Amino acid sequence: MFCRLSFLFFSLFFCSISFTHGKVLVDTTASSKMLSEVFVLGNSGIKGNGSLVDFDGVRLLAAKKSELIVLSKMDANLANQSFREVFGRTPGLHVIESDPSGFNTSIAIRGLSTNRSWDFNMRQNGYDITPDPMGYNEAYYTPSFEWVEKIEIVRGAAALQYGPQVGGLINYVLEKPIFEKKFGGEVQQTFGSFGLNSSLIKFRSGMKKLAFVASHQYRGGDGFRPNSDFNSNQSYFRVDWKPMADGIFTFELTKSNAQAQLGGGISEAQFKVDPWVSNRARNYYYSHWLMPVVKFNYSPSILFNSQIQVFAIQSGRSQLGFTKTNDVLDVPNSAGNYANRSLDRDEYTSYGAEFRSGLNAFNEKWQTSVGLRIFRGNMFRQQQGIANNGSTYSENLVDPKFPRSLNFVNQNFSAFIENALSISPKFKLAGGLRYEYILSQGDGFLDNNSKFLSPDRLRSFILWGVGASFKPSSALEIYGNASQSFRPISFSDLLPSSTTDVVDLDLKDARSLNFDLGIRGKKGNFLRYDMSVYFLEFTDRIGNLSMKNSNSQSYLYRTNLGSSSSKGIELYAEMDPISILHGSSRYGQISVFVSVGLNNAVYDNFPLTSGENLAGKKLENAPQQILRSGLTYTYQRLSFTYQTSFTAESFSDAQNTVKPTPTGTIGLIPGYTLDDFSFTYKYRKHWLLKGSVNNVMNVSYFTRRGTGAFPGFGILPGAPRNVSCTLGFTF
């Protein structure tokens, strides 16, 4: 692994000292059109990440660290939701790889939580896709990567315009309809290892004032472990109506249904003998998602743009299974009967509206973005239901009453303003404020007899952010920013673990302060790079303290009591050596990339119930090095990519336990190196052939130790070597 990386670093360095012998091509043609990408690649071999424009009409991203991933330029395995390949050029992004279905996204940066991407503000086409960004920001829905045109990433400084979370924004951008485009579409069929079967069909058409795109994907498989089969159906429909030259109405509807069998976690001993064994045969997960959205975009001139969107989410998830730890076997009793299973069920209903407007005045010297957001989210949670003792998925209960029944509501109003002022043609200052108003409420039953009532928690506060950008040329930028963000109080924070525990009446949202300083740019058509350093301070982290009441009885008191910090380096660079040496080649183009994330994430102060303080301990699931490198070769209609990914070891618990427990729930997560190969071949105008081999060396590895019944206690292994092939036809 390190030899491969060293070779790539040497190649980059060798080419960097040769720049003076090449030509720098700069397009000086002025344009008033707002672009969605910064870099135009031309005919070079570079296929990697770009960054977002400073101002796109309603969003102001000047001086922020941003990335743009264009999936159509990738050879990656999209049908199998290969997060490791799709985010391969994104430095420092940690991917949890234990879900063969690919339904849930579990990614993080800078030592933050990987739990279903909790610390990212997850969106699709600019609107929420999580149940409640304020109280339950878990990504149980992920759009099919075969739908996604590009992925926008804005790190911590996105908080001013998007609110929570600490990690920043991830926005999946799906295909847009095109006006005056004749009827057409595409079909893709994928088969792969472990019974993978994916079918995609898409239609599109456009008239003068009306255009639409509609697609459906079915994906299923047996999974790479026993008892891990899955299936999903996702549908997406969008229609654009242009009743006037300056305005477009948009309606979008997304529907998803997914079911997966959960093979459970395994012990340390089991992993050493057979990494892909299963302990559970009767555990299941099910989710349903429905998201209607209405938008209106108004652009009367290049100076002023506005957008309003009204959105809703009606969704839910259920978990069914045998919930004991993995050292307790799920076997029938002497009478031949299995134990009853437990059923947990959530239903989410949320809706809201956002208004954004942008002003681009004085020949782009003054750019302003303002916005308003209103939101209401409701979660109805039922837990510990006594289900049947069967082996198939069923939500039928032996006792129709759930012992635990809870209802949580969040109401949110926010407003922001952000401005960028060009002091000179090369230097720009940016800054802004965001106001948040949040009301959290909850009630229900902790068990059949214990009433739970959470007091109304009303809070309001202001976040600030500043930044600066210096562009000595159109191909080079030095940028920096400092911004505040927050992780809202979650519904689980408001829920005591027992009837005797107490939650602080003055519990606050956790706060963060993020700093970025970097340099990014390009050299002609043969080099692109983005190098930065960061510091992230995270305060008011929520935890439990052991207390005693007036009767000397012990109880847990949940309050704000801890802080942590992360600092590191993020580097992405990609070059085309053939363009450097020859400008072009009759034998094709080569693109070499390297992505480096170096991260030191530690607790600064965090007292525990035992009296211990976690000061100096490493944060959980926060590897200190994430290194990826790869090579893409393109010749006419053929392209292939080989990628190597190294992830260093990390700890699964805050105490930094090295020696694993027998069940595998706690202990060191060893580092690992994985290789992926993929190719694309386009035949004539209509046919497409893609293939991939993931985990080429068939490495046994894992990225997570489970500490709960779902998806399972113990080690949750990653996928072994797997192969897939896709045939597509466009009409």
Please report, for each region that a protein language model flagged, where it lies by residue.
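Structural signature of Gram-negative outer-membrane beta-barrels, strongest in the C-terminal barrel
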Residues: 365-367, 372-377, 404-537, 589, ...
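Transmembrane beta-barrel wall of Gram-negative outer-membrane proteins
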Residues: 191-220, 225-263, 284-305, 362-363, ...
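Membrane-embedded beta-barrel scaffold of Gram-negative outer-membrane proteins
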Residues: 200, 297-299, 303-321, 471, ...
